[in-house]
Structure formats: C-alpha cells, structure tokens
C-alpha cells in the first residue's frame, strides 16, 4: 500500500481544508514546490495534488504550480484533481508530465466522459468519488447527490479506470480515522483498485486499513496528519512495506 502525501492548492498556496469547506482552510506553505520536495525527500512514491480553486470554478486555476512540480520530479507519479472537466485539460496535464488525472464532479454528472477520457488517455484516468453517508457529493462537495458510491464505481469497471480515490467528507481534515468499513466494502465490490482518503491521523489508521485485508486498497492519501506531524511519511511507508498481518 502506498502512502500518498496530499498537496491542496488554493490561491497558489498549500492549504488544508476541514470537511471540504473553503472558508475553513489552514495555510501550511506559500511554496508548494518546496513542500513537494519535502515529501519526496521523505521517500514518498506518489503525490496527490488538488486544485481547490479549480474544483469550485470547473477549470484549472493552479495549473502552473502543478506543472512546476511535475517538471521538477519527472520520475515521480503525480495525480491531480480539481476542475478536470474536459479532454483539453487532461491533455494539458498529461503533456506537462502528470501521471494521472482525477475526474470527480464530471464523472458523477456525465459518466460517459470517463469512458471517453480512458479511451483518449489509457492508463491515465482516476475517478474521485467523494461521499457523505454513502452518497456521492459533487462541485467541491457543495452538492450531495442521490447516487450511491458503490453503484457508480461499478459503472466504471468496463472503462479502464486506473483507480478510485474514495474520500469520506465527514472524516476529511478531522483526523479521526478514515472510514475503513466502507473503504473495504468498496474495494471488495469493484474490480477497480481503491485509494483511501480522508481522516487519517496516525500509524494506527494505516494499520487499520492494512488489517482490513482488502487487496484492492492500493494506497492511502494523507494531508493534515503529515503537516501537523502526527504521521511520518517515511515511517508509514516502511510500516506498509513490512506489514505481515
């Protein structure tokens, strides 16, 4: 299982939100590129970037920062989400050296777009499903739909999606542990690999994900915990690598 540091971009700075609320943000650095350097030096094998302004505006806003990080680390897999709603945007990021693009809102509102994107950019597409009480939320989490996460995830199996990033909104940024039972249920209900996100606080939460014994869970995204020091990237990755269970 991969430990994937998150860099959330808002107005060019690296921030963390609580429960997806833009007004409840903490700035951790005004230099996201050096923040990326910190996690790379800490031994991370993949980075998770989110253009928060982009998620709300429906188009990339912090694209230059993303490109700068991708250029600096050409051999590091980078995944970017937030405001990806056209094939042109995907092409822009892929050309910039980004390994994976995460389609969120558009995947819920126009699932056929995912099939289109997978066809145009095979192996590059991840679907981001953000949920509240098992139902999918969209538009920077401002709207909660009547679509169930597992039902939607199964829809994408035939498209060739590389992974699903599953975020439990109620847990995100709260550092109270992630929703292990639902993450496990999702991983077991679909053939698509799942990346857990939201609520990871310490090594105990990483252990809980591993203890779930769901081979489909291939990664865990962590944000606030690594910024506030309750989780160490290198230590957590070593724990995953050596886990015997």
Swiss-Prot record:
Compartments where located: Cytoplasm
InterPro entries: Aldolase_TIM, His_biosynth, HisA_bact_arch, Isoase_HisA-like, Isoase_HisA-like_bact, RibuloseP-bd_barrel
Positions of transmembrane segments: none
EC assignment: 5.3.1.16
Reactions catalysed: 1-(5-phospho-beta-D-ribosyl)-5-[(5-phospho-beta-D-ribosylamino)methylideneamino]imidazole-4-carboxamide = 5-[(5-phospho-1-deoxy-D-ribulos-1-ylimino)methylamino]-1-(5-phospho-beta-D-ribosyl)imidazole-4-carboxamide
GO biological-process terms attached to the record: L-histidine biosynthetic process; L-tryptophan biosynthetic process
Pathway(s) annotated for this protein in UniProt: Amino-acid biosynthesis; L-histidine biosynthesis; L-histidine from 5-phospho-alpha-D-ribose 1-diphosphate: step 4/9
Keywords for this protein: Amino-acid biosynthesis, Cytoplasm, Histidine biosynthesis, Isomerase
Active site annotation, chain numbering: 8 (proton acceptor), 130 (proton donor)
Pfam families with a match to the protein in the record: His_biosynth
GO annotations of cellular component type: cytoplasm
Enzyme class, first EC level, given as a word: isomerase
GO molecular function annotation: 1-(5-phosphoribosyl)-5-[(5-phosphoribosylamino)methylideneamino]imidazole-4-carboxamide isomerase activity
Gene3D superfamilies: Aldolase class I
Sequence similarity: Belongs to the HisA/HisF family.
Alphabetical list of NCBIfam families matching this protein: 1-(5-phosphoribosyl)-5-[(5-phosphoribosylamino)methylideneamino]imidazole-4-carboxamide isomerase
UniProt protein name: 1-(5-phosphoribosyl)-5-[(5-phosphoribosylamino)methylideneamino] imidazole-4-carboxamide isomerase
Organism encoding this protein: Pseudomonas putida (strain ATCC 700007 / DSM 6899 / JCM 31910 / BCRC 17059 / LMG 24140 / F1)
């Amino acid at each position: 299982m991969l430990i994937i540091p998150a860099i959330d971009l808002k107005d060019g700075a690296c921030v963390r939100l609580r429960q997806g609320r833009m007004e409840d943000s903490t700035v951790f650095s005004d230099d996201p590129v050096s923040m990326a350097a910190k996690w790379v030096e800490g031994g991370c094998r993949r980075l998770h970037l989110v253009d928060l302004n982009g998620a709300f505006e429906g188009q990339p806003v912090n694209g230059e920062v993303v490109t700068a990080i991708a250029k600096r680390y050409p051999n590091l897999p980078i995944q970017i989400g937030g405001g990806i709603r056209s094939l042109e945007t995907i092409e822009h990021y892929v050309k910039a050296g980004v390994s994976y693009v995460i389609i969120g809102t558009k995947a819920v509102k126009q699932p056929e777009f995912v099939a289109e994107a997978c066809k145009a950019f095979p192996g590059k597409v991840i679907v981001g499903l953000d949920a509240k009480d098992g139902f999918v939320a969209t538009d920077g989490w401002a709207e909660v739909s009547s679509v169930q996460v597992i039902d939607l995830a199964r829809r994408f199996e035939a498209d060739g999606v590389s992974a699903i990033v599953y975020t439990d909104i109620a847990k995100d940024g709260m550092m109270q542990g992630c929703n292990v039972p639902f993450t496990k249920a999702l991983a077991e209900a679909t053939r698509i690999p799942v990346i857990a996100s939201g609520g990871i606080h310490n090594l105990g939460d990483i252990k809980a994900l591993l203890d779930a014994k769901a081979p489909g869970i291939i990664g865990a995204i962590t944000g606030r915990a690594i910024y506030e020091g309750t989780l160490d990237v290198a230590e957590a990755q070593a724990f995953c690598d050596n886990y015997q269970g």
